[in-house]
Design a protein with these regions (language model features):
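N-terminal secretory signal peptides
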Residues: 1-9, 22-23, 27
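N-terminal cap/lid segment of alpha/beta-hydrolase-fold proteins
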Residues: 39-71
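Short, surface-exposed "cap/lid" segments of acyl-processing enzymes
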Residues: 70-75, 79-111
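Short glycine-enriched nucleophile-adjacent loop
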Residues: 169-180
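Alpha/beta-hydrolase
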Residues: 200-282
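Catalytic histidine-centered segment of alpha/beta-hydrolase-like enzymes
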Residues: 315-325
């Protein structure tokens, strides 16, 4: 049975009517980063948790809307938020940072009018910890196990929008290639293609032998804190690091090794031509995992002409938790909410 809860979070003023570049200029000239944070006010959301099964593996699902579903009402568009290698879903997409404004993508996209879902992959968060590696392939199976519950609860059978963060974007890409009829519009945040000239992956590959021999890797406080400084200092509010540590470490100080093994020894995971859905590839200016040239190579091979490539200024690898995160929300929602073309020739 689903676990129904209610909680209160902040309301932000939605940035509308201007492009991403103009929004960046407004944020950089009108106020300091501390003053420019999205405003927070009291608001109540409708939340539920569910448990999916992949054999004996229990997978925790999360859901948020502005209001409870009402029988007979048209369903809301469904969006699934997909976490990366080192953090589970709720610390990634529903983080509270005291005094620093809104960080919760659950809140933001519920306000935009979506039925928002997320999953803790095998070995992460509230899902089962197993002897498995929880690699990209396993993540695809986890997403597949999630689908019957999403369909049952939302009454929507296909066209699920998905936003993947880092290795979560690789999971989304692989899932979309295998299940083209399930997905709608896709956002690949902090994506990785071949890893060519990546300083972060070059450094990470020094531990390849460890990744091959161990199904879990250390993920201590210091590693979580480094996410906010390793690419470019000043792109994140360091209060966010403290909040993330407090939210994530209760789940333990290790995480599965599979995605690190995939990203240091098996890239490219999926060829661009295999993804038929509309895609937004979105990269932070200072991302140390994937170069702009590598991602433009991937982008140029996407077969669907309904595609966009966006570089966000003043941001590093983790767009979800960066100081300029409003730009990420704006770009993602604008792409997901695009009108359908009148003609395709």
């Amino acid at each position: 049975m689903p676990d129904t809860t209610r909680d209160t979070h902040g309301r932000r003023t939605v940035l509308t009517g201007i492009g991403v570049a103009a929004a960046a200029a407004a944020m950089s000239t009108a106020a300091t980063p501390a003053d420019a944070q999205p405003a927070v006010a009291t608001e109540t959301f409708w939340n539920q948790r569910y448990e999916a099964r992949k054999g004996d593996v229990k997978l925790q699902l999360y859901r948020r809307r502005l209001k409870a579903p009402v029988a007979g009402e048209a369903p809301l568009p469904v969006i699934i938020l997909v976490h990366g290698s080192s953090m589970s879903s709720m610390p990634t997409f529903d983080l509270t940072v005291p005094g620093a404004g809104e960080y919760s993508m659950f809140n933001v996209f519920a306000r935009y009018g979506y039925d928002v879902w997320a999953i803790d992959f095998e070995g992460y968060g509230r899902s089962s910890v197993t002897p498995g590696w929880s690699d990209i392939k396993a993540g695809v199976a986890d997403l597949a196990a999630m689908m019957p519950i999403v369909e049952r609860e939302t009454k929507v059978q296909r066209g699920y929008h998905m936003i993947g963060e880092s290795s979560g974007a690789l999971r989304v890409a692989a899932f979309a290639a295998e299940n083209p009829n399930r997905v709608g519009r896709l956002v690949f945040s902090a994506y990785t293609y071949t890893g060519k000239d990546s300083p972060t992956l070059t450094e990470r590959a020094k531990n390849l032998d460890f990744y091959r021999k161990n199904n879990r890797r250390p993920r201590p406080k210091e590693m979580l804190e480094s996410i906010f400084t390793r690419d470019k200092a000043g792109t994140s509010d360091l209060r966010t690091a403290a909040a993330l540590v407090a939210a994530e470490l209760p789940f333990g100080d290790t995480v599965p090794t599979g995605t690190y093994l995939d990203m240091t020894s098996k890239l490219p995971i999926i060829e661009a031509k295999a993804i038929k859905a509309p895609v937004l590839v979105i990269r932070g200016e200072h991302d140390g995992i994937a170069t702009e040239a590598d991602l433009l190579d991937f982008y140029s091979q996407l077969p669907n002409a309904d595609r966009q490539f966006v570089t966000l200024p003043g941001m590093a690898h983790t767009l979800v938790l960066g100081t300029n995160r409003e730009l990420f929300w704006y770009a993602s929602h604008s792409f997901l909410n695009m009108p359908k073309p009148l003609v395709t020739v």
